[in-house]
């Protein structure tokens, strides 16, 4: 087995391998950090490489913390029955991974989100690492594998659901029978696709 295969096997079931103990120690530190942090290198090198990361200029790795569970909506100021306030029991129509990608994109507006992957969770939070690319960097522009991200129609791709997590949330992994209301978009089909 090559190095990447060993890493992948260890991360398949983190609690049973050495990764579990490492994660415990790391999360103690991660909880004290801000929600969005730029890091030097990926925690899961095998996953990052599989999703398009390269150790060269123009690539940035960002670790994002997202609160788990449903979305608590803001409290109303006007008077109403507490049961009709509509604060709890509403879940967002986006995955936490997609939300994490958007958080990273807002923190670094000059970069584009390429992809992301899970790195850990506890009872309150989930952590994802987001691979970001600088579309204006000459190294990126001259690399034919990633130069497409510099084109203007890929600007703000994460906010339009064009990343892998976004496409999954929009139901675009399905096609054929049962997926008639998914394309061109859920909104075009008056929300019947979800």
Swiss-Prot record:
Region spans: Disordered: 164-194
Molecular functions per Gene Ontology: RNA binding; structural constituent of ribosome
Record-linked InterPro entries: Rbsml_eL15_core_dom_sf (IPR024794), Ribosomal_eL15 (IPR000439), Ribosomal_eL15_arc (IPR020926), Ribosomal_eL15_CS (IPR020925), Ribosomal_uL23/eL15/eS24_sf (IPR012678)
Biased composition range(s): Basic and acidic residues: 177-194
Cystine connections: none
GO BP field: cytoplasmic translation
Pfam hit, one: Ribosomal_L15e
Ribosomal protein in keyword set: yes
GO cellular component: cytosolic large ribosomal subunit
Alphabetized SUPFAM superfamilies for the sequence: Ribosomal proteins S24e, L23 and L15e
Presence of the UniProt keyword Acyltransferase in the record: no
Protein keywords: Ribonucleoprotein, Ribosomal protein
Any coiled-coil regions, as ranges: none
Record field: compositional bias (Basic residues): 167-176
HAMAP family per UniProt: Ribosomal_eL15
Family, per entry: Belongs to the eukaryotic ribosomal protein eL15 family.
Protein name (record): Large ribosomal subunit protein eL15
Species this protein is from: Pyrococcus abyssi (strain GE5 / Orsay)
């Amino acid at each position: 087995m090559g190095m990447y295969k060993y890493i992948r096997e260890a991360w398949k079931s983190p609690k049973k391998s050495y990764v579990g103990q490492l994660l415990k120690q790391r999360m103690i530190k991660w909880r004290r950090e801000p929600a969005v942090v730029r890091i030097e290198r990926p925690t899961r090198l095998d996953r990052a490489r599989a999703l398009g990361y390269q150790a060269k200029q123009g690539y940035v790795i960002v670790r994002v913390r997202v609160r788990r569970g449903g979305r608590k909506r803001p409290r109303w100021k006007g008077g109403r029955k507490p049961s009709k306030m509509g604060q709890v029991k509403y879940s967002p129509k986006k995955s936490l991974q997609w939300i994490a990608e958007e958080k990273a994109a807002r923190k670094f507006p000059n970069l584009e989100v390429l992809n992301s992957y899970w790195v850990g969770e506890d009872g309150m939070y989930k952590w994802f690492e987001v691979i970001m690319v600088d579309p204006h960097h000459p190294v990126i522009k001259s690399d034919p594998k990633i130069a497409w991200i510099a084109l203007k129609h890929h600007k703000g791709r994460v906010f339009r659901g064009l990343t892998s997590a976004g496409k999954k949330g929009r139901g675009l992994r399905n096609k054929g029978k049962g997926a008639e209301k998914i394309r061109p978009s859920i909104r075009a089909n008056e929300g019947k696709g979800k």
